[in-house]
Amino acid sequence: MFDSTLNPLWQRYILAVQEEVKPALGCTEPISLALAAAVAAAELEGPVERVEAWVSPNLMKNGLGVTVPGTGMVGLPIAAALGALGGNANAGLEVLKDATAQAIADAKALLAAGKVSVKIQEPCNEILFSRAKVWNGEKWACVTIVGGHTNIVHIETHNSVVFTQQACVAEGEQESPLTVLSRTTLAEILKFVNEVPFAAIRFILDSAKLNCALSQEGLSGKWGLHIGATLEKQCERGLLAKDLSSSIVIRTSAASDARMGGATLPAMSNSGSGNQGITATMPVVVVAEHFGADDERLARALMLSHLSAIYIHNQLPRLSALCAATTAAMGAAAGMAWLVDGRYETISMAISSMIGDVSGMICDGASNSCAMKVSTSASAAWKAVLMALDDTAVTGNEGIVAHDVEQSIANLCALASHSMQQTDRQIIEIMASKAR
């Protein structure tokens, strides 16, 4: 996987990125439920006749308004049904990649027959929780995912417990590669990016390949709010400048348009989110192309962006009231700043300005409008880089921004982890009242 002679800390960084930067087809909250249903169906004796599911309030929030790839339908019920009838139980976040037209038709028929139910799990102390129970007559199989979008903790059928994660942990499971991030700094991450052998991080170029393809699909104008395609038209009409800033926003938002609109192309995700992966990737790719960067420079910039985004998000709940496109864009700001001048001071100033700019953006569930927030975050990231290049940034005398970038990040994450919990409850209450 990598050179065993590498610095052990660098090995952990690479493992963390490989753990958190993965292909994902469809918005990852509905996909998490689809995966639970697919794994349950694989354990069931006989074809699935009925699906019951329970999810955490946060997962419900992120599943109410997003299109499930290939179906033209929004919401968790179609995700659960298609996972059960057409999902690949071994494909992780790409669980629906092999779903056939017949499976989609069967899933819609199951919904129409009233054989699929999705409810909020009560009580639920988990931020990310999905459980799917599939039935064939009196026989059933049930799968529970907790904590991470693919983190299966329990598999049970009508006659036995097939798997429970607690048993594995008791036998001595290895420490998560993300643990190292709680003991590191942005300065150490930058040193890694500057010095690690290119061969060890070449794999990160796959994020550019996948997300550029998604962006190109989004520019067709068929998906979501077609923000990218619309802004591109306005450039042609002379209402928007054809410049680097516009290109960053257009190509980044186009990928999110396709992602949230249900395109059947995978995104390279970051921290369990396709939009975070898009936001950490596309601005860096556009700037790299502008400067004619070769594959090695692009890989280093992408590694800095993705690892910085993971580093920041690791201090947050997996799902929260804070729109995490903003924190992914902080990673993008780091990657873009590195491409332009590479100095730690520029990178840290850009991140500080981002925290002073878009830190209040809420997450009100996954939907087509996520592409609006992605475009805003990408634009803010480039603005922060331009300011930093002129030695200008939001200072430690202002708001939640501190004199030290590490403390600024900690302040933002404390806000999201604690004070914004009530915000999250209010958002979920508002969305639930609309659904009734």
Swiss-Prot record:
Coiled coil spans: none
Swiss-Prot/TrEMBL GO biological process terms: L-cysteine catabolic process to pyruvate
InterPro entries in the cross-refs: Ser_deHydtase-like_asu (IPR005130), UPF0597 (IPR021144)
Single GO MF descriptor: L-cysteine desulfhydrase activity
Pfam families: SDH_alpha
HAMAP family found in the cross-reference section: UPF0597
PANTHER family: UPF0597 PROTEIN YHAM
Family: Belongs to the UPF0597 family.
Name of this chain's protein: UPF0597 protein YhaM
Organism name: Shigella boydii serotype 4 (strain Sb227)
